[in-house]
């Protein structure tokens, strides 16, 4: 060791997305990852890379220097209560939408940056690449009660609806929609979509276990 540089700027918050090049942190935005980024896990003294960052949780403190995240310290254990699921287009062909249309029978709270507004019950909200709300970054939709219908998608059961919250983001390729929901509520939706409810109860239980295990792994 010929020298030590102390880096004291720390950013903490729920991770909304991560890639090889950047990490998006709630309340802070997207920050570039240093090419030599490493993460130290205090619980088991492991050193890992960006692929070990868990999206949807605030488990680590990110060390920032010169506008880039150069490292992170994971100091909290994972207690997986929620799951974040990217919603695909009709036919599950793509993750990018040209337009995203939502509606909630109870109305919604729409959060854009530091601002928010409410929609009336049954009111439709439309997002496209020209929507000015995207200037504030990621948009969050919260139903006042019940679920939110995603009218831009058609499934075998018709127009799908989602509990929890919906996040809408604009990328160069199009609009990406993410549903954050409790694990158990997610399983209530995914298991019936994977096998008929008329199947034997034990078979349904096995499918629920498989779906839960897959969700935790992902």
Task: Name each model-derived stretch.
Residues 1-218:
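Conserved, single-site charged/polar hotspot
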């Amino acid at each position: 060791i010929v020298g030590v540089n102390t880096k004291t700027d720390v950013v903490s918050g729920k991770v909304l997305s991560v890639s090889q090049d950047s990490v998006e942190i709630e309340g802070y935005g997207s920050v570039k990852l240093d090419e030599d980024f490493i993460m130290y896990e205090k619980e088991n003294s492991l050193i890992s890379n960006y692929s070990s960052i868990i999206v949807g949780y605030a488990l680590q403190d990110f060390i920032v220097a010169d506008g880039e995240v150069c490292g992170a310290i994971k100091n909290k254990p994972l207690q997986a209560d929620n799951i974040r699921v990217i919603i695909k287009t009709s036919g599950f062909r793509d993750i990018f939408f040209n337009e995203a249309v939502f509606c909630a029978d109870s109305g919604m709270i729409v959060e854009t940056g530091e601002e928010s507004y409410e929609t009336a019950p049954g009111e439709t909200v439309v997002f496209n690449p020209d929507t000015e709300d995207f200037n504030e970054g990621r948009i969050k939709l919260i139903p006042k009660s019940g679920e939110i219908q995603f009218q831009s998608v058609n499934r075998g059961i018709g127009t799908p609806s989602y509990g929890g919250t919906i996040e809408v983001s604009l990328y160069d390729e199009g609009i990406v929609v993410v549903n954050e929901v409790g694990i158990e509520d997610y399983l209530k939706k995914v298991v019936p979509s994977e096998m008929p409810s008329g199947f034997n109860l034990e078979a349904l239980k096995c499918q629920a276990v498989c779906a839960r295990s897959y969700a935790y792994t992902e």
